[in-house]
């Protein structure tokens, strides 16, 4: 007797479950038609993409951040009034205040606020400063898991490897050819101006 009841009821239960599922999906797609994927995920209580990837709105273009770039070697990146790039340990030095402008997704240009020079890297990996922004001034900004950022030339590479902005233990710029993402000389904290 039980076998007959299950055989008769099971197709009805499956049909109703599928019907409810189709109605639910259809309702969600109609309600979320004008929403971005992030908004849709949030509205249907799914895990949002931010939960799995790090979302940084400022990396999407047009944003300007004013920061001091503090290297893990204990030096602030500085561009002086003559356009010389080096490190300083003076926190309150006006030449270490940088304007970090987003050029494209993950690409930034770094400009000294006081000196009005842009940070640039040539094909040999040497850091220098320019009054006018060009492709040499574009850097790929990467946020590492240790909360430091790296800045690699968006234009130049060396033997297939990226060339990074880096300051050695004496605050002297390291040529990009000698840098790697894992080196602490290439790790910077963008510190808010206080």
Swiss-Prot record:
Family: Belongs to the heparin-binding growth factors family.
A GO molecular-function descriptor: heparin binding
Stated name of the protein: Fibroblast growth factor 7
UniProt xrefs under InterPro entries: Fibroblast_GF_fam, IL1/FGF
Gene Ontology annotations for the cellular component aspect, listed alphabetically: extracellular region; GABA-ergic synapse; Golgi apparatus; postsynapse
GO annotation terms (biological process): actin cytoskeleton organization; branching involved in salivary gland morphogenesis; endothelial cell proliferation; epithelial cell proliferation; fibroblast growth factor receptor signaling pathway; hair follicle morphogenesis; mesenchymal cell proliferation; myoblast proliferation
Assembly description: Interacts with FGFBP1. Interacts with FGFR2. Affinity between fibroblast growth factors (FGFs) and their receptors is increased by heparan sulfate glycosaminoglycans that function as coreceptors.
Glycosylation sites: 45
Keyword annotations of the record: Glycoprotein, Growth factor, Heparin-binding, Mitogen, Secreted, Signal
Protein's job: Plays an important role in the regulation of embryonic development, cell proliferation and cell differentiation. Required for normal branching morphogenesis. Growth factor active on keratinocytes. Possible major paracrine effector of normal epithelial cell proliferation.
Cell compartments where the protein resides: Secreted
Pfam families, A to Z: FGF
Signal peptide residue numbers: 1-31
Organism of origin: Mus musculus
């Amino acid at each position: 007797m039980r076998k007959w009841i299950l055989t008769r009821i099971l197709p009805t239960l499956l049909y109703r479950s599928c019907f409810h599922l189709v109605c639910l999906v259809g309702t969600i797609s109609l309600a979320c038609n004008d929403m971005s994927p992030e908004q849709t995920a949030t509205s249907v209580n799914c895990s949002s993409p931010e939960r799995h990837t790090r979302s940084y709105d400022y990396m999407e273009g047009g944003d300007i951040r004013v920061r001091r770039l503090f290297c893990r070697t204990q030096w602030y990146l500085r561009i002086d009034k003559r356009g010389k790039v080096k490190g300083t340990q003076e926190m309150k030095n006006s030449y270490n205040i940088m304007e970090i402008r987003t050029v494209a997704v993950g690409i930034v240009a770094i400009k000294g606020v006081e000196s009005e020079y842009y940070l640039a890297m040539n094909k040999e990996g040497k850091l220098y400063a320019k009054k006018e922004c060009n492709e040499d001034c574009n850097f790929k900004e990467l946020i590492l898991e240790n909360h430091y950022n790296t800045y690699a030339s968006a234009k130049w590479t060396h033997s297939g490897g990226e060339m990074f902005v880096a300051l050695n233990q004496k605050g002297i710029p390291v040529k990009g050819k000698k840098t790697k993402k894992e080196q602490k000389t290439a790790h910077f904290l963008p510190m808010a101006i206080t």
